[in-house]
From Swiss-Prot:
One annotated GO biological process: phospholipid metabolic process
PROSITE patterns: PA2_ASP, PA2_HIS
Protein source organism: Micrurus nigrocinctus
Tissue localization of expression: Expressed by the venom gland.
Name of the molecule in the record: Basic phospholipase A2 nigroxin B
EC identifiers of the protein: 3.1.1.4
Length: 118
């Protein structure tokens, strides 16, 4: 769920999780156009992963709670998750790790999607 995702971001990143809520064309609610950079691409992939979870697992990823461990920046989805919970956990894990590796461009925070997301 979104709280677990927020906590995964906090585990793997020094930047505050809010920095990822309204970034580029895909970080935050919805998304369209071409990702503006590598970090925005992480969010596009995460959105697609959630879409797949909705169709394949018949669940609501933003509401699906799962079990995971965070230790020294390492994320592990626990074995006791159901198939759907594990799928969503891995969507969030992959995105959080991607956020940690991708450069952050301040100019892409709170961009106008009508102008920058074609």
């Amino acid at each position: 769920n979104l709280i677990d995702f927020k906590n995964m971001i906090k585990c793997t990143n020094t930047r505050h999780w809010v920095s990822f809520t309204n970034y580029g064309c895909y970080c935050g609610y919805g998304g369209s156009g071409t990702p503006v950079d590598e970090l925005d691409k992480c969010c596009q992939v995460h959105d697609k992963c959630y879409d797949t979870a909705k169709h394949v697992c018949k669940c609501s990823p933003s509401m699906t709670m799962y079990s995971y461990d965070c230790s020294e920046g390492k994320l592990t989805c626990k074995d006791n998750n159901t198939k759907c919970k594990d799928f969503v956990c891995n969507c969030d894990r992959t995105a959080a790790l991607c956020f940690a590796k991708a450069p952050y461009n301040n100019k892409n925070f709170k961009i106008d999607p009508t102008k920058g997301c074609q």
